[in-house]
């Protein structure tokens, strides 16, 4: 492999929606940082068989609904 072109791999903590934490090697963040998941196999309707739950963390869905309210979306 060519030197200096590949990102550095390091250990990070991944926090699932139920609070469990596990370690993985990743290029995300810095060594020891924690990535908190908003959706994972424990909470996703595709794996749980439940109804879809809309997570509007950035307000994008609300903005879309307000913009196109007259169209009946």
Swiss-Prot record:
Organism taxonomic ancestry: Bacteria, Pseudomonadati, Pseudomonadota, Alphaproteobacteria, Rhodobacterales
Transmembrane segments annotated in the record for this chain: none
Assembly and binders: Part of the 50S ribosomal subunit.
Example of a GO MF term: structural constituent of ribosome
PROSITE patterns per record: RIBOSOMAL_L31
Any single biological process term in GO: translation
UniProt function note: Binds the 23S rRNA.
Organism of provenance: Cereibacter sphaeroides (strain ATCC 17025 / ATH 2.4.3) (Rhodobacter sphaeroides)
Official protein name in the record: Large ribosomal subunit protein bL31
NCBIfam families in alphabetical order: L31, PRK00528.1
Family membership: Belongs to the bacterial ribosomal protein bL31 family. Type A subfamily.
Entry keywords, A to Z: Ribonucleoprotein, Ribosomal protein, RNA-binding, rRNA-binding
